[in-house]
Design a protein with these regions (language model features):
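Conserved Walker B
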Residues: 10, 321-325, 354
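Pre-Walker A-like glycine/lysine-rich segment at the N-terminus of P-loop NTPase domains
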Residues: 2-68
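C-terminal lobe/lid and adjacent interdomain/linker elements of RecA-like ASCE P-loop ATPase modules
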Residues: 1-4, 333-412
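Short alpha-helix of the ABC ATPase nucleotide-binding domain corresponding to the H-loop/switch region
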Residues: 327-332
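Phosphate-binding glycine-rich loops of NTP-binding sites
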Residues: 43-90, 300-301, 306
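Electropositive, glycine-dotted interaction segments
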Residues: 118-265
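Short N-terminal edge-element motif at the start of the domain
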Residues: 75-101, 109-114, 123-124
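Conserved ABC ATPase signature
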Residues: 48-54, 268-308, 312-326
Length: 412
């Protein structure tokens, strides 16, 4: 489960931004017993959160930052920042040495074994600047550092700008001596420099393996700049097909239309040719291909796969721009479904729909805003919990938001 995630200097976010998935420590959480998971490690972790903001405010950049971090774990190629992903206000020159190109990503999670992992990565346009990885066994326990790597020297080799020699200060502890010996031999590297934690996993460190697997398999980031249903329509992933054929998937799908009583999956084109079967009040059976059904049904059909992964596979899903399908009524059904099941999955989604601003279904810690500074155009991420004057008996959150009192609305 995700405990917290923060990042800095990514796209429209110049300063540090953070999402914290811990439930509040006060009595408020007792009003929402289904909204969080009480872990054996001493944490109360939220199951859901919503991020609200205007168009072009930075919601997608927030989710894309996590997608970028996740992509770092896919291979062992050199890791560095890209100018197109650095905050524009930190790029005052074409010369990297005269710009602030360093980006930072920090994430804390609970692995499947119950071990708590804390990972920090700092990169610039050249390569890794600093990387650390530690673990502990409980919320109150002391973190034990496994690896700390800091760039000491960087110099160019030959005529190609991309040919760099890097020397790192590396400290390894709390792992096998054999692993430590291997890493001491990589302190000076002339080739590709992947993540140190990934290398730890490759050589067999159990903690690194668990964390890397969590980043690759448990974390799901869906951030598409076009219709999600159309995106899924051009894919044919076996894992999606497996989920679609589960009886429990139909239970989720029926939230969009309770007249749906069955589906006939098309193995070749499951997101377009699958037949949706409905039953009328009179008992008549109607069948229609998904591509000929309403856009809302098609869109929810695609997103229902991710909801399945949250509830039945304990995945951490970040979903961007689900407004086309999650109207307030359907969103309430979906959140109630996720909260009502016993699991360790999490669902965080972004939305323009201010009707999600509801303290009947959410704690203040579950509602986040993204707003943009009118002068610098920098984005900021913050929680409704940052407004102590907002009480749980407040019914005017929508009104406060529309007046700009809570931020997150477009400026003139």
């Amino acid at each position: 489960m995700l405990i917290s995630y923060r990042f800095k200097n990514f796209c429209s976010f110049a300063e540090e931004a953070e999402i914290d998935m811990m439930a509040p420590g006060n009595k408020v959480k007792h009003r929402f017993p289904d909204n969080y998971v009480k872990t054996e490690e001493g944490y109360d972790i939220l199951k859901t959160a919503v991020v609200i903001g205007e168009n072009a405010g930075g919601k997608t950049n927030f989710i894309n930052s996590l997608s970028f971090l996740k992509s770092m774990f896919e291979d062992n190629k050199v890791k560095h920042s890209y100018r197109s992903l650095i905050n524009i206000n930190n790029l005052q020159s074409e010369c990297p040495a005269e710009c602030e190109t360093k980006q930072e990503f920090d994430i804390s999670v609970i692995g499947e074994s119950g071990t708590i992992y804390h990972y920090n990565l700092q990169i610039d346009e050249f390569c890794i600047v600093q990387e650390s990885f530690s673990f502990k066994q409980s919320k109150t326990g002391k973190e034990k550092k496994i690896i700390y790597a800091k760039r000491e020297h960087l110099k160019q080799i030959g005529d190609k700008p991309s040919s760099m020699a890097v020397e790192f200060e590396i400290k390894i502890d709390n792992c096998d001596k054999e692993i430590q010996t291997v890493f001491e031999q990589t302190a000076y590297n002339k080739g590709a420099m992947g993540l140190f934690v990934s290398k730890l996993a490759i050589v067999g460190d159990s903690h690194a393996i668990e964390f890397v697997n969590w980043m690759n398999d448990k974390l799901v980031v869906e951030s598409k700049n076009y219709n999600y249903y159309l995106y899924k329509n051009i894919q044919n992933e076996e894992d999606d097909l497996r989920i679609l054929k589960e009886d429990r998937f139909l239970e989720i799908l029926r939230m969009v239309d309770y007249s749906i009583c069955g589906i006939e999956i098309d193995d070749e084109k499951p997101f377009s040719m699958t037949k949706i079967i409905r039953k009328t009040k009179d008992g008549n059976i109607l069948s229609r291909e998904l591509r000929r059904d309403s856009g809302g049904v098609g869109e929810f059909f695609a997103w229902a796969v991710q909801i399945f992964r949250v509830v039945y596979e304990n995945k951490m899903v970040f979903a961007d721009e689900v407004d086309r399908v999650l109207n307030p009524i359907l969103a309430e059904r979906m959140i109630a479904f996720i909260n009502g099941k016993d699991h360790k999955g999490q669902f965080v989604f972004s939305s323009h729909n201010v009707l999600h601003l509801d303290l009947k279904n959410y704690m203040k810690e579950q509602i986040y805003f993204v707003t943009k500074n009118r002068d610098t155009l920098d984005s900021e991420l913050y929680s409704l919990a940052d407004f102590p004057e907002i009480k749980y008996d407040t019914t005017k959150i929508y009104e406060f938001y529309m007046k700009g009192i809570l931020g997150g609305t477009a400026f003139e």
